[in-house]
Design a protein with these regions (language model features):
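Short beta-strand/loop motif that positions the catalytic acidic residue
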Residues: 113-115
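Short, proline-enriched alpha-helix->beta-strand connector loops that line the catalytic pocket
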Residues: 106-111, 133-136
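Hydrophobic residues on the short alpha-helix immediately C-terminal to a glycine-rich phosphate/catalytic loop
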Residues: 15, 159-162
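Helix-loop "lid/cap" segments that line or gate small-molecule binding pockets
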Residues: 66-76
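Conserved loop-alpha-helix segment in the C-terminal half of the alpha/beta-hydrolase fold
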Residues: 117-143, 149, 154, 161-162
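Active-site nucleophile elbow and catalytic-triad environment of alpha/beta-hydrolase enzymes
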Residues: 87-105
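Gly/Ala-rich beta-loop-alpha elbow adjacent to hydrolase catalytic centers
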Residues: 3-8, 12
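Flexible "cap/lid" loop of the alpha/beta hydrolase fold
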Residues: 17-66, 93-97, 122, 130
């Protein structure tokens, strides 16, 4: 079973076609279809959708603006923990934006999707649309993009449900 959060959903979608993978779990994640990438999924945001505070590339990598991290990524996480998360960001390669999925695993694998209803990075309507298209079993919970930090019990329960499903 693969579990992906955010961009990790792209990785799970592509890698999940491996025969040893039997299930997928998306946590406020991108779930692209064939030939889609993060770039194609974010090119036409819904009207009024928040714009993620991604800084211009630095040496081929992307980061979120630390000053806006708490409000945009982890609004339901206490300020001290959110500041630590902002400081500990892992750089994201610019090339990852355009990496298109060749064969989406969700077409042939059962999958679950947790929609974070207060997410300001991937709009909840976009999450719902990707989950519906993937035929996912959907759970919704109030939470930011960092729902795995603010609501770990909800995330763990969904993973447990998927892991024990027939």
């Amino acid at each position: 079973m693969l579990v992906g959060h955010s961009y990790g959903g792209v990785v799970a979608t592509e890698a999940g076609t491996d025969p040893t993978v039997t299930k997928l779990v998306y946590i406020a994640a991108f779930a692209p279809d064939r030939a889609e990438s993060v770039a194609t999924l974010i090119q036409n945001p819904p009207p009024g959708a928040p714009v993620p505070p991604i800084l211009p590339p630095q040496d081929g990598f992307l980061f979120l603006d630390k000053a806006k991290f708490h409000a945009s990524f982890a609004a339901d996480v206490d300020a001290e923990k959110a500041a630590f998360m902002a400081d500990a960001q892992v750089p994201w390669g610019v090339g990852a934006l355009d990496g298109a999925v060749t064969e989406p695993a969700w077409r042939t694998r059962p999958n679950w999707y947790l929609v974070a209803t207060d997410d300001k990075m991937i709009p909840p309507p976009a999450q719902r649309a990707m989950a519906e298209r993937a035929g996912a079993t959907v759970t919704e919970a109030e939470g930011s993009h960092a729902i795995y930090v603010s609501k770990p019990d909800v995330v763990a329960a969904l993973i447990r449900t998927a892991a024990t499903a027939a």
